Amino acid sequence: METEENLTYIWLNEGWDSYLDNIRHILPAVVAFHILTTLPATLIWKYFDNRWYAIPYELFIAAPLTIGMNLFFINIARGRIAEYGDIFKGFSMFLNVIGVSIVFGLIVAGGFLMFIVPGVIWGIMYGFAQYAVIDRKTGVKDSFSYSAMITYGYKHNLLFIFLLWMTIEILAPGVITSTGGLRHPNLALDVKPWVITSFVLKTFIFLPWLDMAMAKAYIRLVKNKETEQSTENNEPDLSL
């Protein structure tokens, strides 16, 4: 029986099942996504020998592709046929997507600077802004308002998924690393066997699974809010 207490398990379980059922569609999309986002940014970084030169590409190209991947997972979670073109649909709302990406990054970064806890809370509260902007075609402000609205009362259910994602990112570092100071971060590669193994597992299994789980959670919370609003609208007016 579905209860508020086991929603986290339901989302993770449904996400895993959807990942396995659609793995033939998901893995090529994940590969294409990383080729389009990570590879060019890395080449720019290597060419200029400075991480900061890759920031414009990551913001104006990789960010819309990331939002498009959210739509890709949302459509799979809804039982629709996976379309690789979804990955590029973030460019159809370019300004809103860039705005949401920048504001969300600033909110989370600011929260983590305030002793981490606010960053986690704000990350959960506003995380679905990156879904609403492409799924519901909302503006920047409305995307954050909508995310806060549908996550109200469910932050504790999303907390475990968020912490699981953070743990995976910490325990499975990337092959591409940075050396040097903040002003001049240099490109370095870590090709130790355990690093490569953990990177492959993270990139092609764990993170796509959590992406599917978050898409399932988003759909469920949207449905809950729509049901709640429909019930309120259908209540009889008892005022005299």
What function would you assign to each model-found segment?
Residues A32-I35, L39-L43, I67, T167, ...:
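Alpha-helical hydrophobic membrane-insertion segments
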Residues L182-D190:
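Intrinsically disordered, low-complexity Ser/Thr- and acidic-rich flexible linkers and loops
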Residues R24-A62:
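Long, hydrophobic/aromatic N-terminal blocks
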Residues M166, L182, F199, D237-S239:
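Transmembrane helix recognition focused on a "late"/terminal membrane span
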Residues T37-D49, I170-R183:
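Juxtamembrane "helix exit" motif at the C-terminal ends of alpha-helical transmembrane segments
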Residues E226-L240:
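Short, intrinsically disordered, charge-rich cytosolic tails of integral membrane proteins
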Residues T3, Y47-R80, G105-S145, K155, ...:
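Selective recognition of hydrophobic, aromatic-rich stretches within alpha-helical transmembrane segments
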Residues T3-L39, I81-G110, W122-P173, D211-M212, ...:
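Interfacial aromatic "cap" segments that immediately flank transmembrane helices
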